[in-house]
């Protein structure tokens, strides 16, 4: 009964006007969204994650585009996840890092790192934005709604090399965003942050790790297919099905 009421509530949520897509600028995007006021219960948050929602700032949202269905909600079933040999090498390579989990806490050091990360990784995308504009977005998107959130920091000799914001529901962790120092490419800090937080979720007894949207063939979002085993949310039924099964069913995607 409760899930039925939640589903009816989700179906009634507003849909935004169309705007230029941040992944494909030549396309239009829309989201279905819920502004959060105060703390949301972890069981309810889990229902939203299971329904394909993720969070930015104080907004839970999922894509609801008319002409495109390529933003696929992607999760790792943790009871099946075992680090590969390459993943174990990555853990060993970064074994000198100090990893801490705690409540999200904004510092000047993190702001400076965020700017360096954005200017390095997304140079063409943020070229028209000032540092102040980027930082305002960071503060709202990552630190503006700390309820049910965790921050993981990666440090070397007291210097922060990276941080990651995660949302914690009853049965899963959801990756919100990660930032890392572009001067350490050999460490693969982005992959290390995902791997370490997946293992942390397993330690917590979570069932799933949500990686956000997977866009097959997209230069910035295709990498998620390497985090296996995995499940993709079926848009029409809201069921989560194994990656391989989804791939066969939707052979027209840019796999």
UniProtKB/Swiss-Prot annotation:
EC number per UniProt: 2.3.2.29
Gene Ontology MF term list: arginyl-tRNA--protein transferase activity; leucyl-tRNA--protein transferase activity
BP terms from Gene Ontology: ubiquitin-dependent protein catabolic process via the N-end rule pathway
Keyword Transferase: yes
Keyword Cytoplasm: yes
Segments forming a coiled coil: none
GO cellular-component term (any): cytoplasm
Primary site of residence: cytoplasm
Domain of life: Bacteria
InterPro entries tied to this protein: Acyl_CoA_acyltransferase, Asp_Glu_LeuTrfase, N-end_Aminoacyl_Trfase, N-end_Aminoacyl_Trfase_C, N-end_Aminoacyl_Trfase_N
UniProt catalytic activity: N-terminal L-glutamyl-[protein] + L-leucyl-tRNA(Leu) = N-terminal L-leucyl-L-glutamyl-[protein] + tRNA(Leu) + H(+); N-terminal L-aspartyl-[protein] + L-leucyl-tRNA(Leu) = N-terminal L-leucyl-L-aspartyl-[protein] + tRNA(Leu) + H(+)
Annotated compartments: Cytoplasm
Signal sequence residues: none
Stored HAMAP family: Bpt
Function, in words: Functions in the N-end rule pathway of protein degradation where it conjugates Leu from its aminoacyl-tRNA to the N-termini of proteins containing an N-terminal aspartate or glutamate.
Protein name per the record: Aspartate/glutamate leucyltransferase
Organism in which the protein naturally occurs: Leptospira borgpetersenii serovar Hardjo-bovis (strain JB197)
């Amino acid at each position: 009964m409760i899930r039925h009421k939640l589903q009816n509530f989700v179906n009634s949520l507003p849909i935004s006007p169309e705007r230029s897509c941040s992944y494909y600028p030549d396309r239009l995007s829309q989201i279905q969204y819920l502004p959060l006021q105060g703390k949301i219960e972890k069981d309810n948050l889990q229902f939203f994650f299971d329904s394909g929602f993720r969070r930015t700032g104080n907004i839970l949202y999922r894509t609801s585009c008319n002409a495109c269905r390529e933003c696929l909600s992607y999760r790792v079933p943790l009871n099946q996840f075992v680090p590969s040999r390459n993943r174990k090498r990555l853990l060993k390579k970064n074994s000198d890092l100090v990893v801490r989990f705690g409540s999200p806490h904004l510092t000047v050091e993190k702001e400076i790192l965020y700017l360096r990360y954005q200017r390095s990784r997304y140079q063409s995308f943020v070229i028209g934005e000032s540092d102040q504009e980027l930082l305002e977005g960071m503060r709202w998107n990552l630190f503006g709604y700390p309820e049910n959130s965790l921050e993981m920091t990666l440090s070397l000799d007291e210097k922060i090399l990276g941080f990651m914001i995660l949302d914690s529901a009853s049965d899963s962790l959801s990756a919100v965003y990660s930032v890392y120092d572009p001067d350490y490419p050999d460490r693969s800090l982005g992959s290390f942050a995902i791997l370490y937080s997946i293992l942390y979720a397993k330690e917590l007894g979570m069932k799933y790790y949500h990686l956000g949207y997977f866009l097959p063939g997209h230069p910035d979002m295709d990498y998620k297919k390497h985090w296996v085993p995995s499940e993709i949310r079926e848009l029409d039924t809201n069921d989560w099905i194994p990656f391989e099964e989804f791939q066969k069913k939707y052979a027209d995607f840019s796999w």
